[in-house]
């Protein structure tokens, strides 16, 4: 009985840690959408699709990530569970390209 409880508890904990997946597209040196939303306390995985003809470097000091996405490709960025807030990210190769992650 104890073993069955541990297995169920482990399965529930593993599911609780599955990341929230957010898709972000970079097109014409703009983020689409420019504002994303995710719940507090959950890990996040950004799937970033770069439709530009040049590379983009998606970066965020607040979210602690930096990743180059080559032209015409996609990549993923993983973010730890967050507290509520509004977090900025940007394209370091094109500084006018700005976006936000809102965590209510």
How should each PLM-predicted stretch be described?
Residues 34-52, 74-82, 86-90:
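Beta-strand cores of secreted/periplasmic/IMS beta-sandwich domains, seen most often
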Residues 1-10:
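Bacterial N-terminal signal peptides
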